[in-house]
Amino acid sequence: FVHCDLQEVNLCDANLYTCKFILCCGLETAIVNDKTLYYRPQCPMNGSFIGYKGAWCYDPELHIRPVLVTLEIPADAYRSSATTRKCRCDKAIVLDAYTLSNGQQLPNTVPIHSAYDGCFVYTIGQTLQVVDCNTNRWDECSTGIHFFMEEEDARWWIESWINAYVL
């Protein structure tokens, strides 16, 4: 759903498992209960926690390699999720990163790039902040630091991205 006005729409009994809502209005009053699976945030709304991000780096031969980044989302960070398992935040601490091919931990001197914006670099030990993070939780693919709660989801996502856009 892109640029949709959903204010008068009845989505009862609709399976929205794979749907994305991009720049839609009218979702602010969505009913959240046991029947609206995935409407509840996928990440904790309080406290700090660990998240995982798929990213990439160059190997010594300048080939693009998928990387799994471990992030700490601090207690004061904005965080959200829409209707899928993908989450977003405005601040994260980069704890570590390793290559998916051999599990090698990367040193903090290796630039790790966002798949969406190659100029957005993750450096181990640094705190990143996105000042213009979109706080509309239903705008899933908007500005912010994207991550998953489960390592397996981040791994699958970056492998899919590499296969679709690089190989």
Annotate each PLM feature.
Residues L6, F21, G26, C89-K91, ...:
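Residue-level detector of bioactive/disordered segments in secreted/extracellular proteins
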Residues L11, N136, I162-L167:
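Intrinsically disordered, low-complexity regulatory segments
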Residues F1-H63, R79:
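Tandem repeat scaffolds
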Residues R137-I158:
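Extended catalytic/binding region for NAD+/ADP-ribose chemistry, centered on the ART fold
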Residues Y39-I112, F120, N136, I145-H146:
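Conserved mixed alpha/beta catalytic, RNA-binding, or beta-rich assembly cores of soluble enzyme
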Residues D117-E140:
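Short aromatic-glycine-(Arg/Gly/Cys) micro-motifs in beta-strand/loop hairpins
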Residues F1-Q7, A154, S160-Y165:
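Extended, small-residue-rich solenoid/repeat segments and analogous flexible loops
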